[in-house]
Amino acid sequence: MIQPQTLLNVADNSGARKLMCIRVIGAAGNQRYARIGDVIIAVIKDAVPQMPLERSEVIRAVIVRTRKEFKGDDGIIIRYDDNAAVIIDQKGNPKGTRVFGAVAEELRELNYTKIVSLAPEVL
């Protein structure tokens, strides 16, 4: 569960390393916590030098991994080692060209097929 002030890792090669959630938009409107597949507004806390994204820039991101366990559609409980997000644009397309680490299969059902196709592993 991601809420405002939560620090997240960035799971793509867009240039940012760490994000801090400042607002949860969610998939279904105004929510208190973000889960896998929800959209958040975040600020970049750490970035790679000489990249398009810089520190203190406000961006949109979709949650791809959470430490809080969740039950999949088939009943399996999945829990990841970190909280991670992929930076997206206004249309929902990822800004990076690679995605690092595993992502949840629920992203495919939420029409984030580009993120799923870039990921090396889908759980």
UniProtKB/Swiss-Prot annotation:
Record carries keyword Disulfide bond: no
GO annotation, cellular component aspect: chloroplast; cytosolic large ribosomal subunit
Residue ranges that the Swiss-Prot or TrEMBL entry lists as coiled coil: none
CDD domains in alphabetical order: Ribosomal_uL14
UniProt GO molecular function: large ribosomal subunit rRNA binding; structural constituent of ribosome
InterPro entries linked: Ribosomal_uL14, Ribosomal_uL14_bac-type, Ribosomal_uL14_CS, Ribosomal_uL14_sf
Intrachain disulfide bonds: none
Subcellular location: Plastid, Chloroplast
UniProt-listed PROSITE patterns: RIBOSOMAL_L14
Gene Ontology biological process terms from the UniProt entry: translation
Family stated for the protein in its record: Belongs to the universal ribosomal protein uL14 family.
Task performed by this protein: Binds to 23S rRNA.
The protein's assembly and partners: Part of the 50S ribosomal subunit.
Protein name: Large ribosomal subunit protein uL14c
Organism field: Saccharum officinarum (Sugarcane)
Taxonomic lineage of the native organism: Eukaryota, Viridiplantae, Streptophyta, Embryophyta, Tracheophyta
